[in-house]
């Protein structure tokens, strides 16, 4: 019976669940400063067999626990670097604000590198804390820069000028200096001029050397050459005819007369050939004179303006002159007519020669007899 009880007791002990437990006193004894060491997970292994099964590797650890351990180590390293960076900035605060180095810029670049690995709120809070510190330092540097640029002590500058010019406020009262001799003031401004000219590039003034007399403008000499030439021309009889008086009222209006003459030639052609319009270029072009051609164009423009004829383009897109009946003439004289158009004709000497050759114009339609 004793043997059976012992065997049952052994079996009961094997069937019980055994736990590997770490006492709380031993856990509390771990140093809190060892923050840089990787976090260790205390796992309670539930064993149903003997203790030899633990060493055989049958109890596997979850890979997620290993990943969490690695992430915790990375985050702890980032926090440590952030704290170290803020500590260095606090220690060098005076040098960063008062000097012109790039310490603040380098610290911001280092913080940007650390921020690339931030994935949790705790590290992001440290980054925000560092940014607040950096912004305060930047504000202090900006205030110091503005104060240095805008600072100008007017009184100190005036004292420096007086000392440089040989005057000193400490030698007497300001009222005494206001009544100083003109020679002292002149010497002061001469000293200022001498110093200022050394900083300015300026050419020396040019002075003429005329001797001891005072320069006076010379009297203008009368021009006798022109009078001599006029006398010679009068003696030789080469003087042009002088125009005593121009009386325009004694001459008839040449433009109106020429327009009426050309209108008569045009109406004669229309009566002879009522159904055949005349070519504009053949009518106005004078193959022997470019100036006469320009005058003919000028006179024909009055005929078209008054509505005695009109200009249009034929099938070849060339200008032609054709007569107008009584109704069309009334419409042409009406200033409110919407069909009236104005144009500008330009004609060069080369274009005149080309037109004469192209149209084979050998004789002018507008004769010269009445000129």
UniProtKB/Swiss-Prot annotation:
Its localization reads:
Nucleus; Cytoplasm; Chromosome, Telomere
Q: Mention any one GO cellular component term assigned to this protein in its UniProt record.
A: cytoplasm
This protein's major location comes to: nucleus
Query: What's a Pfam family this protein contains?
Result: Nse4-Nse3_bdg
Task: Give UniProt keywords alphabetically.
Answer: Chromosome, Cytoplasm, DNA damage, DNA recombination, DNA repair, Nucleus, Repressor, Telomere, Transcription, Transcription regulation
Extract the InterPro entries matched here. Answer: Nse4/EID, Nse4_C, Nse4_Nse3-bd
Q: Name one GO biological process term.
A: DNA recombination
Family, as annotated: Belongs to the NSE4 family.
Q: How does this polypeptide assemble, per the annotation?
A: Component of the SMC5-SMC6 complex which consists at least of SMC5, SMC6, NSMCE2, NSMCE1, NSMCE4A or EID3 and NSMCE3. NSMCE1, NSMCE4A or EID3 and NSMCE3 probably form a subcomplex that bridges the head domains of the SMC5:SMC6 heterodimer. Homodimer, and heterodimer with EID2. Interacts with the C-terminal region of CREBBP.
Outline what the protein does.
Answer: Tissue-specific component of the SMC5-SMC6 complex, a complex involved in repair of DNA double-strand breaks by homologous recombination. The complex may promote sister chromatid homologous recombination by recruiting the SMC1-SMC3 cohesin complex to double-strand breaks. The complex is required for telomere maintenance via recombination and mediates sumoylation of shelterin complex (telosome) components.
* PANTHER family given in the database record: EP300-INTERACTING INHIBITOR OF DIFFERENTIATION 3, NON-STRUCTURAL MAINTENANCE OF CHROMOSOMES ELEMENT 4
Listed name of the protein: EP300-interacting inhibitor of differentiation 3
User: Lineage from the top down?
Assistant: Eukaryota, Metazoa, Chordata, Craniata, Vertebrata
- Its encoding gene is what? EID3
């Amino acid at each position: 019976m004793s043997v059976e009880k012992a065997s049952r007791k052994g079996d009961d002990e094997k069937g019980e669940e055994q736990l590997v437990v770490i006492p709380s006193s031993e856990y509390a004894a771990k140093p809190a400063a060892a923050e840089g060491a990787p976090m260790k997970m205390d796992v309670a292994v539930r064993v149903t067999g003997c203790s030899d099964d633990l060493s055989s590797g049958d109890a596997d650890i979850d890979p997620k626990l290993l990943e969490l351990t690695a992430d915790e180590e990375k985050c702890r390293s980032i926090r440590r670097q952030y704290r170290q960076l803020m500590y260095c900035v606090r220690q060098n605060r005076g040098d960063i604000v008062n000097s012109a180095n790039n310490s603040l810029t380098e610290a911001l670049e280092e913080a940007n590198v650390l921020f690339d690995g931030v994935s949790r709120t705790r590290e992001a809070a440290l980054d925000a804390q560092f940014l607040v510190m950096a912004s305060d330092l930047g504000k202090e540097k900006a205030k110091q820069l503005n104060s240095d640029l805008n600072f100008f002590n007017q009184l100190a500058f005036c004292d420096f000028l007086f000392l440089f010019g040989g005057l000193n406020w400490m030698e007497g009262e300001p009222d005494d200096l206001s009544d100083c001799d003109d020679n002292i003031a002149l010497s002061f401004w001469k000293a200022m001029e001498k110093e200022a000219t050394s900083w300015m590039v300026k050419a020396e003034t040019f002075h003429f050397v005329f001797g001891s007399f005072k320069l006076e403008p010379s009297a203008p000499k009368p021009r006798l050459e022109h009078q001599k030439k006029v006398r010679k021309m009068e003696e030789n009889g080469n003087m042009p005819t002088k125009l005593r008086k121009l009386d325009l009222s004694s001459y008839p209006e040449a433009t109106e007369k020429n327009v009426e003459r050309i209108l008569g030639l045009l109406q004669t052609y229309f009566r002879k050939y009522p159904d055949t319009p005349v070519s504009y270029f053949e009518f106005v072009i004078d193959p022997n004179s470019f100036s006469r051609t320009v005058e003919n164009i000028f006179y024909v423009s009055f005929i078209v303006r008054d509505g005695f004829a009109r200009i249009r383009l034929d099938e070849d897109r060339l200008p032609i002159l054709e007569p107008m009946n009584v109704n069309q003439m009334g419409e042409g004289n009406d200033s409110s007519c919407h069909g009236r158009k104005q144009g500008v004709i330009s004609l060069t000497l080369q274009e005149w020669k080309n037109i004469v050759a192209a149209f084979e114009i050998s004789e002018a339609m507008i004769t010269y007899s009445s000129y």
